[in-house]
Amino acid sequence: MGKTRIKKGDLVQVITRVRGRRNADGTKTSDLGKQGKVLEVIAETDRVLVEGVNRIKRHTKARPGVEGGIVEREAPIHISNVQLVDPETKKPTRVGIRTEQVERDGRTKTNRIRVAKRSGKDI
């Protein structure tokens, strides 16, 4: 469980296959290369929810006030299986940190800025 450099709202790309995924007809499927926006970061388990990636079907039982049926939603994917998409090149990139000293009201504050390693641009 480390400090993650991927945040909610970032555009990421899946860089590995997720094991055990199958289509309805039993053939293997993969989200490799798909891009999507991060919906949620689960820091405790180092996982992220990515829009349109790793979709699963849940069979829910009807309860009072809630209709039952098959619900399709995103399942978490490990953070090591995704990479941030560089805003300039639109390709996956690693993320670096650049520190910047800002002086305001006589006090010095350090800002940490995320930087795309591929292009060197701020994220």
From Swiss-Prot:
Gene3D superfamilies documented for this protein: 2.30.30.30
A Pfam family annotated for this UniProt entry: ribosomal_L24
Annotated SUPFAM superfamilies: Translation proteins SH3-like domain
TM stretches of this protein: none
Keyword terms of this UniProt record: Ribonucleoprotein, Ribosomal protein, RNA-binding, rRNA-binding
GO cellular component: ribonucleoprotein complex; ribosome
RNA-binding is among the record's keywords: yes
GO biological process, one term: translation
Superkingdom of source: Bacteria
Single annotated GO MF: rRNA binding
Family: Belongs to the universal ribosomal protein uL24 family.
Quaternary structure, from the entry: Part of the 50S ribosomal subunit.
Matching NCBIfam families: rplX_bact
Function according to Swiss-Prot or TrEMBL: One of two assembly initiator proteins, it binds directly to the 5'-end of the 23S rRNA, where it nucleates assembly of the 50S subunit.
Protein name stated in the entry: Large ribosomal subunit protein uL24
